[in-house]
Regions:
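ABC family nucleotide-binding domain
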Residues: 3-225
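C-terminal boundary and immediately downstream tail of ABC-type ATPase nucleotide-binding domains
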Residues: 226-246
Length: 246
């Protein structure tokens, strides 16, 4: 039986009096790619940020390896070392080189040896075709190159789960496929456990083991990927897919 790595039960999230997430329930198995789909404003990114402690929640439980997470700042600081996140906006430090961006958290936060992390970073940069840019600054890179560095930076922390929030949304169309291929390799070669938010339906179809379809902060479908794209169970999901060009 495949190990369950993350479980969410009855999660509610509010901004003031407005409820952004309603009774969210799902589990994630080791090596699985879970894709969050739905229209803009459906709660996908809010859910992703909640799973990394960047947003708090008012009700429900999150379990990591069967351990219930205490929703405190200290607990999330420790957990973020195991749950990596890559953002749409890259979030690289502009005053640091590519290599310095990658080394910072593993060395300063995880207290690992710099030589060990540097070797790992060099191998990861080569895998994403960025081996010649380790001394470059973010301002010298294209959007696609910055996103590759952001992925490497997250992977250098040796995360158990990788969260990807619309990582191709800010890229030129010609850059999108290259970044998508990196994620596909992480899934197929490394069996990396991932939760992916995307509007790229072809990409989602290629990588999704499971799909959560959300609208208005609610999960309308929790369906295996191979079934969702061929035969969605709800009229709203069928309408959503019909509106997408894929």
């Amino acid at each position: 039986m495949t190990e369950e790595i993350l479980k969410v039960e009855h999660l509610d999230k509010y901004y003031g009096n407005w409820q952004a997430l309603h009774d969210i329930n799902f589990n994630l198995k080791k090596g699985e790619v879970l894709t969050l789909l739905g229209p803009s404003g459906s709660g996908k990114s809010t859910l992703l940020r909640t799973l990394n402690g960047l947003e708090d929640y008012q009700k429900g439980s999150i379990y990591f390896h069967d351990k219930k997470i205490d929703p405190t700042i200290k607990e999330w600081q420790l957990l973020r070392q195991k749950i990596g996140m890559v953002f749409q906006s890259y979030d690289l430090f502009p005053n640091l080189t590519v290599m310095e961006n990658i080394l910072l958290a593993p060395v300063k936060v995880q207290k690992r040896q710099e030589d060990e992390v540097r070797k790992q970073a060099e191998e990861l940069l080569e895998r994403v075709g960025m081996q010649d840019y380790e001394n470059s600054y973010p301002r010298e890179l294209s959007g696609g190159q910055k996103q590759r560095v952001a992925i490497v930076r997250a992977m250098a922390m040796n995360p158990k789960i990788l969260l990807l929030d619309e990582i191709t949304a800010s890229l030129d169309p010609e850059m999108v496929r290259g970044v998508q291929e990196i994620i596909e390799h992480l899934s197929n070669r490394d069996h990396m456990t991932m939760i992916v938010v995307t509007h790229q339906i072809n990409f989602a179809e290629n990588i999704a083991d499971e799909v959560l379809f959300l609208e208005d902060g609610r999960i309308l479908e929790d369906t295996p990927g191979k079934d969702f794209f061929k035969n969605p169970q709800t009229a709203r999901a069928r309408e959503f897919l019909d509106s997408m060009d894929f």
